[in-house]
Amino acid sequence: MRDHVGIPIEMAIASVDQRLREEGIRHKCSIIASGGIRCSADVVKAIALGADAVYIGTAALIAMGCTMCQKCYTGKCAWGICTQDPELSKRLNPKVAAKRLVNLLRGWSLEIK
């Protein structure tokens, strides 16, 4: 495990898929790719390399209006996306954020087709 920490997601997916197949347990688990998924091409690449699903955390946040101020962990997100603070969360319009996220996913879906 230690030898594979920090490798690019493409190499990690292929390596995990291959190892699970060698062990005969690939059918017993799912590979979910996370990190570095920035566009629909990255989704296609991950699936082609053996991932069963992808996680698109940062792309989804940016679609919702995140400016990458990197304060998520503080709970003081300037745009109200990653916060529990009632005053800051007023800055996020959930309907607009949802529409933007739907547009991102719909666009990626059309590109993948």
Go through each PLM region and give its residues.
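Conserved thiamine diphosphate
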Residues: 85-99
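Glycine-rich phosphate/ribose-binding loops and adjacent secondary-structure elements
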Residues: 1-89
